[in-house]
Structure formats: structure tokens, C-alpha cells
Amino acid sequence: APSPRDVDPQREACAAEVAAAYARESPTPTATRRYAITAAPAEVQQFDGRLLKVWAYDERVPGPILRVRLGEELEVKLTNRLPQPTTIHWHGVRVPNAMDGVPGVTQEPIAPGASYTYRFVPKDAGTFWFHPHVRGAEQIERGLYGVLIVDDREPLPYSRDEVWVLDDWRLGPDGQVDPRFVTRHDLAHDGRWGQAITVNGDAAKEMVVRPGERIRLRLVNPSNG
């Protein structure tokens, strides 16, 4: 346990104020959607047939789509099988302070072999994504990201959902993910380009839309480029 001198009173007071404000706004959930996912090294097949060594949620890139309806509680248990600590940050989602996934600020990092359960009621419908906030330039680039969809309370008038997750991959001479995740060149040029572009982890495919069909296209761009 931290000693009194390790605790930042201002930070603790701010966290308590944010948590209290969130609690005042949060209604009783109508139901709970539960998921259990694992972050671990994996191999996925790229569109050219190459087996790419990645880090992934549930052995897929992008990770699983998590879905919850507005008013429901989302509960996600993350188990860490990576060789380094990790967390989940819910990008663009208004969550309680303790659920924000910022290591050393809102939670301690999840150590290799450990688990952590995130639990909150989303306040807004929409398309969001989740990813680590520990060594993000590396862990996201290795493939750790997924989609969170918060559906409206009542169905909207469209025919079907299409989710496109766009990413670029910087590969080394061996055809694997380049381990130089942040270089001076990247910093000087405000980013970098990858050699391979994927949509949902594969080459872009033609989407057929029938006359009169209404599509809800959900775009997520975790690309580091």
C-alpha cells in the first residue's frame, strides 16, 4: 500500500469529484452485458498469406466487437497474457475515472498473468474503440485494438451495420511488424506511413449495396500513420 507521502491529495480529490459527478448522472442500468477478453501474442494471416506475429485481443485483429445498448451496463474482464503490463482505454467514452485505463493515474497497470474488470454504463450511443494506454505506440501497432458499439435505446431506420476498422502496418525486412515503434524520424515528421493498409485486418473488399438499402457505416481508424 502507498505511504501517505506517495499520495497526491490534489489528484485524489479530483478523482473523487469526478467519480461523484459521474455517479450522480448514472441511472440504474437496465441490464448488464458481460464480456471476457484476453490480450496475448498471436499469429494472424494477412491478405497475402503471410502469418504475421501480433498482439491481439482473443487472437484476432481487430479484436472482438463489444456491443451494448444505451442504458445497459458494460462489464469487460481483461486477462493479460502479454509479456508486459497493459490496460484498456475506452476512446471517446464518458466513463467513471477508475475505468479510464490510464496507468498510474486511474488504475495500476494490469501485470502479465493478472486480470482486471472494467464496469460502466455508457452515456452516449455511437461507435467507439478501445486500446491500451500502456506503451500505446507499441501495443496498438502490434494489433491491440477493438470496437465498442453503443446502440440507441430504440432501433434506427437502417438496413444493416457495416464496421470498417482501418489500419496501416509498418513491416520490417522480415515481413513482420517493425519493432522500431517510435523513431526520431517519426517524431520529427509527426508520424509515419506503413507499407500495408488493411480494412478489418484484411485487404479492402467490395461492399455490395442493393438499391434502396440504407447502410450505417461505422468507421474506426486506429492507424499509427
Please describe what each predicted stretch is.
Residues 3-29, 143-171:
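Extracytoplasmic/periplasmic copper-protein system
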Residues 25-29, 79, 138-140, 154-157, ...:
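A general structural signal for short secondary-structure junctions and capping/turn motifs
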Residues 45, 97, 172-173, 225:
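Flexible loop/turn segments at secondary-structure boundaries
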